[in-house]
Amino acid sequence: GKGIELDSKATKHGRWECREASTPAHIKQLIKKKKKKRDAGYGAKLIDKAIQEFKPDVYIGMEDIWAFNNYNLKPWWHKINTMIWTTLDSLPILPQAVDFAPKVKHYYVWSSFAEKAMKELGYDHVKTLRGSLDENMFFRHNEEDRKKLRESHGLTDEFIVGFVFRNQLRKSVPNILEGFKLFKQKNSKAKLLLHTHWSEGWDIPRLLNEKNIDPSDVLTTYVCSNCLSYEIRPFSGQEQKCNKCGSEKTLNTTNTSRGVTDQQLNEIYNLMDVYCHPFTSGGQEIPIQEAKLSELITLVTNYSCGEDTCTEESGGFPLEWSEYREPGTQFIKASTHALDICDK
């Protein structure tokens, strides 16, 4: 995958020991068997060896719930303090997560939505532990600095609606586009800023064409892999020429391999006038908190972890949604109302 290799210098930066999943030859064998590949990816093949070698006082498991399959049966499980911190973002709660609750004393989830659901099932020891972010990195610039920042990106009196997200299917891109289209009819100066990668997940150009939205009204973030500068402008394809350093084919939409720094991301929030985050479900959705620290009004789907961030005291407005069921899992998912996005 895109993980850090064992011999990478990055493994030397933290105060921890790193272990590789397996030998290259063994990895090739695991790839052929989907379940074994997944288990190895979660560290299941080395956990016993690591416990024996390090003799830890505390085991902290921060993974999807299926990563801990039968860990409670291991001889070391009840001999040390064990804690899991897992993402539960939809109702009904995943059966594996419910079954594991009585098997671990310290059970943490990422949102009070999940804590509430688990307690309704009788598991009062489940608690919420939220993901952390550096609050010193996200703040609102004074109006003069915001004006200069916007002008540096060719923006003057436009009204910018922003959405920071990984381009995944659970992020409701069609919904925000439809809501923006309705809003644009009432506010001619509106622009939509999608800080995401345009070469994965939703085919955004196709959606814009289907919805008859002018591509020039939808902005995105480009990052140069050479000079690390960023540009805010309409999408015009990948591997563009950087306007700052002049490098050819080094400018791409922000992505997991090359993104912006926290300082740059804070600047991008400061380009916005309002932040909108529609999604089907989520564990925490940290960009919502970053936007709040930047003193933006946030519009958030009122489901899953969104329930925590669209309350009156949180500085956010709830977005209405309709239920649909995810095939296979039968999870309840949210389809955010485009009209409510427009009205809010």
List each model region and its residues:
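N-terminal strand-loop element at the rim of the active site
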Residues: 1-41, 197-205
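Short His-centered aromatic/hydrophobic patch
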Residues: 61-67
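Nucleotide-activated donor-binding/catalytic signature segment of Leloir-type glycosyltransferases, i.e.
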Residues: 75, 202-267
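A short helix/loop element that forms part of the nucleotide-sugar donor recognition site in Leloir-type
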Residues: 139-154
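Conserved donor-binding/catalytic core segment of Leloir-type glycosyltransferases
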Residues: 155-171, 177-180, 192-196
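Aromatic "clamp/platform" in nucleotide-sugar-dependent glycosyltransferases that forms part
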Residues: 280
